[in-house]
């Protein structure tokens, strides 16, 4: 999984002397004469009323020659940078979707690794863009998910509920027979494509990954 990959890569970075600050948010970008010079981390140990608790820890300024923003979709620092330097000028607005998925442990020998199926239509209405995916993984894991555009007009639509409806389809239900759901997750997706890519660099900073909108919308892959 991508989580396992990043943990593995993180250990290699630390062995090379790179500091990784887990649990710290980036509260704002630091500037010097319109050049990005780093990030200020967020304060920690603040209660819901904004008061300092006994474990209060003030944020610190981290300076860098180059600040790389890889916050995923709609990151707070990325939005600030895009707005400050008008990086979307002349570009199409970004288009968003959400993917929800479940991992199912199936009986031994029942899943062929590399199996791929895609669906369209049910359970989504005619006015909702999207479809489902089913992947056969190693160790008899079945990956079942549903992706739908976030431009739907009905405020009562619940993507997770739509995934549950998908599992009522006779064919999908037959695939999951005797299986057990072991994990689930969700992720927002930038689907605008090439013409929705912002300008990627400013003096001292750059955008990468979903912050830049690099996902391949046709394959729903960004790595």
Place the predicted regions along the sequence by residue.
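Active-site-adjacent segment of FAD-dependent monooxygenases/related oxidoreductases
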Residues: 1
